[in-house]
Amino acid sequence: MPTLLHLDASPRRRSISRDIGAAFADSWRATAPNGHYIHRDLAADPVPFIDAAWTEICDAVLAAGGTDLAALPTLVRTPAQAAAWRIVEPLLDELLAADVVLIGTPMYNYSIPAALKAWLDQVTFPRMSLAPRRFVVAAARGGSYSPGTPKAAFDHQERYLRDFFAGHFAVTDTVFVTAELANARQDPALAARRAEHDASYADALDTARRLGKEYR
């Protein structure tokens, strides 16, 4: 039975990244009616930031020479570490149970929201490998950051996540489904580019629905 873990990081109840993620999830669930769907709203139910006890667990993993994910609980020694592990364990269980990980996120200040970064920090330990799990990012950004655009070098949303998943999770084929120029909906300075945004948004929704039928 395939499992989809769906994370949302936008604080908006109605947002473009949520819309794109929902298009993928709805298509996935319709195509796999017996699949298991897990949704975690990182904005509505924030994950705590890592603390000193978490770093001690991470140090123990390094000292042990690698990440045997099944053995992680045995590295917990102190009451503070046990409290830290109680935060990590359900998050990591959801991640490891997933065949497909879907992340809906806006671009904030050229990067990702703190809510998503907090989740990444909690579930990431040295030398992990999550391959062959498939990762899909449903992304929105207020401007245009595609290759060849004037602000392409400012994109630390896709670049960061792509590097993170490759470097920490050994997942090198993350797919990004992105709607650009979202600020054209509100910013008079971008009003002339509203049609570009609308086309980008529509294409992202179509792509998300198609991928939702294909990914298992």
Curated annotation (Swiss-Prot):
It comes from the Bacteria. Binds 1 FMN per subunit. It catalyses: 2 a quinone + NADH + H(+) = 2 a 1,4-benzosemiquinone + NAD(+); N,N-dimethyl-1,4-phenylenediamine + anthranilate + 2 NAD(+) = 2-(4-dimethylaminophenyl)diazenylbenzoate + 2 NADH + 2 H(+). It holds the Pfam family Flavodoxin_2. Its EC number is 1.6.5.-, 1.7.1.17. One of its GO terms (molecular function) is FMN binding. FMN binds at S10, S15, I16, S17. Keywords: Flavoprotein, FMN, NAD, Oxidoreductase. The keyword Membrane does not apply. Its cofactor is FMN. Homodimer. Quinone reductase that provides resistance to thiol-specific stress caused by electrophilic quinones. Also exhibits azoreductase activity. Catalyzes the reductive cleavage of the azo bond in aromatic azo compounds to the corresponding amines. Belongs to the azoreductase type 1 family. This is FMN-dependent NADH:quinone oxidoreductase. It comes from Nocardia farcinica (strain IFM 10152). The gene is azoR.
